[in-house]
């Protein structure tokens, strides 16, 4: 079953994006470089709980 997750900026800790992930097949935490409009740059965004 897919579960909703938030992606939070590692620099300012704001939750800018949300997505879903299958926890059975992807057990590790999700992280991706995305644009943070508060920092005004591309930063690493990591999975956070809702």
From Swiss-Prot:
Q: Mind telling me which Pfam families this protein's record contains? A: Ribosomal_L33 (PF00471)
- Give all cystine bridges in this chain: none
Q: Which residues cross the membrane?
A: none
What are the GO BP annotations of this UniProt entry?
Answer: translation
Q: Which top-level group of life is the source organism from? A: Bacteria
Keyword Magnesium tagged = no
Annotated protein name in UniProt: Large ribosomal subunit protein bL33
Identify the species of origin. Sulfurimonas denitrificans (strain ATCC 33889 / DSM 1251) (Thiomicrospira denitrificans (strain ATCC 33889 / DSM 1251))
**Lineage of this protein's species?**
Bacteria, Pseudomonadati, Campylobacterota, Epsilonproteobacteria, Campylobacterales
